[in-house]
Amino acid sequence: YKRQEYGLRQEGQIIINNLCAYIRSPFDLAFRYDELSQDKPSPHGSYRENHQEFSVHRAELLAEAKVRQRALQEIHRRLRHFPQGDRRSYVEGSWSGFEYDFSNSVFFYPVDMKDSWYQNSVDFSGCTYYASAEFSGSTYERSVYFCDSTYYDWVFFNNSTYFGEAQWSGSTYHDSARFSWSVYYGEVSFHDSVYGGSVFFDQSLYYDAASFYSSIYRGETGFDGSLYRGSVFVSDSV
């Protein structure tokens, strides 16, 4: 029975790996998201003299975005379960026990991973988000990596619990970022980051070391009401 269970688990991990590999795979038009997400070509953009190519490329981008977003949705809905249909509380889902590697993905569509429960390690390092990203209300039992990423739209990590190491270091936020009402049991790093919009870390609890050093804050910033049980590093920040 255990061997059968192990075999099923291996099969499940292969399915997850394939879905993640597809989401990670390069798509050339993704880097033209700013232009192609508009209804018509920009007068100063690369399609200003070729409206037909704009229409073709826009349709391609939207179609690919739809497929990738659907793949992410299929993962997301299996990362939590609502007992008795109660949307206010959730438990782990049927796919919560697998490892997830989304590293270096380019998300040219909104990312909605809120209320997810991960029992294994998760890697979102080196990612680029052209649209909004929602990770609020999530539980991470092991390590999670969001480091070296770029967010062009808003991103929310509110009301989450991290039992292992959590990394956001080396990231750039062009819009607002939220990390409020969260609990960190392991080491957490936000150092060497740039916050172009407002950012809030308030009402959070840190049990281990927290690193915020060498960062730049260009918008409104909040650390109110947080409790730090471990060391805090905040030097060389402006």
Listing of model-derived features with the role each one plays in the protein:
Residues R3-V238:
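N-terminal leader/targeting and pre-domain segments
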